[in-house]
Amino acid sequence: GSKIKPDSSGAWNNLIFPLQAMKLQTPEIEELLSRINPKASSMHVQIAKSVLRFSLYQGGKNAENALNEVCNLLSKTDNRSIKNLEVTKKESPPQIIGPDNTVALVHFGRSGTGLLHSLIDDHTEVSTLPSIYLSEYFDHSTWERIISGGWSKMADRFMAIYDVLFDATSTVPVQTKSNRLISNIGRKEGMANVGDQRDEVLSVDKTLFSAELQRLMNCYDQLDAFIFFKLIHRAYDKAINDTTQKNLIFYHIHNPDTHAQLNFVRSTPNANWVMMVREPVQSCESWLGKAFEQNNYTEISNKISDMLF
């Protein structure tokens, strides 16, 4: 048999399609999974196999059990939280938005999530970040990068990873599914030509954001990815001079990697989910139109296969 790197998320994602196809002939999912025996047995490998199991059970009667198994494993991982070794407790923790008041938006193939997001993002009681930059924020590798320099560097590392959040013309790539990178996403998402004349660039003052984020962080003796996520929203609102009280976080998670999505579910199991759908033929036409014009059969077939499985 062929060998794969057991810690490669891309390799694990690539197993989903053939196993979904094989499932049509071999319905016993555990039998299919028994053929995958990576030599490494690290927690990361255990989680990757558990995520794969969930993907195969999704939509079936055992999906909930598979989900609980993944969330249980994710809750045992190292580095889920980071301690503030210089905690001063000068201020009490701010009234941050509760986990129950979070809405996550996912798409189903060119269904108009960007339009819905744009209609919601100016609501005075809603805190939201622009575009889909943070779709992979809850992937374990993102949090590891943010905390890798210690507590004092978290704000700087976040701003470096998501530079496009502060300047839509930034060429710094952001992570997408299977650890792939998208460059110039701000321009591609239309954030570099906003305003009435479409000649303005969406930008945010990093100095203001950083100062507010660090002030909020210093109220805590430790942080995990979800609390930090909420503080990011508070700091962003302050940086754009939005001081109104927020009651809800609207998270355009869009099309996350399964691992990132399940880690978000574990972090806030009571979040509300919205999946946006569109008239199927129109959705397909919008989704495949460019590849069809270019006569790119491979891209068309790959997109349809991804959607079906």
Q: Where are the regions that the model predicts?
A:
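Glycine-rich phosphate-binding P-loop
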Residues: 105-120
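TPR alpha-solenoid repeat register
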Residues: 11, 43-47
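Residue-level recognition of tetratricopeptide repeat
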Residues: 17, 51-56
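PAPS-dependent sulfation machinery
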Residues: 132-252
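PAPS-dependent sulfotransferase catalytic domain
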Residues: 202-309
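Structural marker of alpha-solenoid helical repeat scaffolds
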Residues: 4, 36-39, 73
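Structural signature of tandem alpha-helical TPR/SEL1-like repeats
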Residues: 22-34, 61-65
